[in-house]
């Protein structure tokens, strides 16, 4: 299948899933979660859905477990919105930790900048 078509399907699924998670899921265990990316297999049988979750590790685990239990509902809602597709991919939910990693890198950079301000590097006059 053409890459452009796969990307269109992935983008549409990302939009639908993001809206459904934010507005239609009534499970109180689902915290603040957003769909960051969807990758669809070439045969449209599988879709990796990357989800970013804010909160403590326990809250993130609880939210991810609740979303896993809601996979059937999520897939059904995608099917209702994408009626033109013959098959709807099986959803594989994956926690996206790239935002956490980038926040960690920013913290490390800030710490290094702070240390350089407090203890500037010495330049020896003698060479």
Swiss-Prot record:
Going by the UniProt record, its keywords in alphabetical order are:
Cytoplasm, Ribosome biogenesis
**In this record, what's one Pfam family?**
RBFA
Query: Gene3D superfamilies, from UniProt?
Result: 3.30.300.20
Q: Which InterPro entries match?
A: KH_dom-like_a/b, RbfA, RbfA_dom_sf
Q: Where in the cell is it found?
A: Cytoplasm
Role played? One of several proteins that assist in the late maturation steps of the functional core of the 30S ribosomal subunit. Associates with free 30S ribosomal subunits (but not with 30S subunits that are part of 70S ribosomes or polysomes). Required for efficient processing of 16S rRNA. May interact with the 5'-terminal helix region of 16S rRNA.
State the oligomer form and interacting partners. Answer: Monomer. Binds 30S ribosomal subunits, but not 50S ribosomal subunits or 70S ribosomes.
Question: How is this protein named in the record?
Answer: Ribosome-binding factor A
Record organism: Chloroflexus aggregans (strain MD-66 / DSM 9485)
